[in-house]
C-alpha cells in the first residue's frame, strides 16, 4: 500500500519529483514502525518522535492525525513488516508531502557481524531534546550513516555499529 498524504496510489504513481528539496538537499524527516500482528509497535512514541523531528526541521502544520491514520491503515493490512513515513519538503520551505508505505520484513543473515565506525555527526546524548539544534531529529540526510555502513561491508562485516568519540553505541 502506498499513500501520498491521504491518497492511496499505485507503486508506479508513488514518485518523488526531482525538484523536491528532499531529493537534492535531504530535507525531510522519517519514522519506521515495526508491524506486529496488524498493529504498529510503539505508535504513540513514534508519533511523538516524529513531532519532535518536524519541530526541529521546521515542518509546520503537519497533520499528525493523518499520519497516524495512514500508519494504522497500512499496518491493518499486514501481519508483519514495517510502515515507513516520510515527510519531505517540496519546492519551497512552506510546502511538504507525507509519503507512507509498507515494507516487508528485512531478511537478516544467520550470522551478523558489526564493525565499529566513528559517527561524530551523530547525537551522542549530549544535547537537550528541546533545543533548536537538529541533532536528535530523524532526518532523511543519511549519507554519513550509509558511508560508514559501506566501509564496514567493504571490510567484510555485515553492518556498521556507529559510536561516538567516547565509544558509546549510537546506532
Q: Locations of the language-model features?
A:
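Ordered, amphipathic secondary-structure segments that act as subunit-interaction surfaces
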Residues: 76-89, 94
Amino acid at each position: 500500500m502506498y499513500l501520498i498524504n491521504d491518497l492511496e496510489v499505485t507503486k508506479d504513481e508513488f514518485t518523488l519529483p526531482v525538484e523536491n528539496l528532499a531529493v537534492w538537499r535531504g530535507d525531510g524527516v522519517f519514522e519506521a514502525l515495526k508491524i506486529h500482528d496488524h498493529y504498529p509497535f510503539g505508535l504513540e512514541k513514534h508519533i511523538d518522535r516524529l513531532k519532535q523531528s518536524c519541530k526541529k526541521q521546521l515542518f509546520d502544520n503537519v497533520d499528525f492525525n493523518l499520519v497516524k491514520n495512514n500508519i494504522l491503515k497500512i499496518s491493518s493490512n499486514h501481519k508483519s513488516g514495517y510502515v515507513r513515513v516520510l515527510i519531505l519538503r517540496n519546492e519551497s520551505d512552506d510546502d511538504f508531502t507525507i509519503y507512507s508505505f509498507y515494507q516487508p520484513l528485512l531478511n537478516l543473515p544467520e550470522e551478523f557481524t558489526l564493525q565499529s565506525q566513528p559517527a561524530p555527526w551523530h547525537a551522542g546524548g549530549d544535547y537537550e531534546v528541546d533545543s533548536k539544534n537538529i541533532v536528535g531529529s530523524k532526518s532523511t540526510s543519511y549519507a554519513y550513516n550509509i558511508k560508514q555502513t559501506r566501509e564496514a561491508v567493504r571490510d567484510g562485516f555485515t553492518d556498521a555499529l556507529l559510536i561516538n568519540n567516547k565509544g558509546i553505541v549510537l546506532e
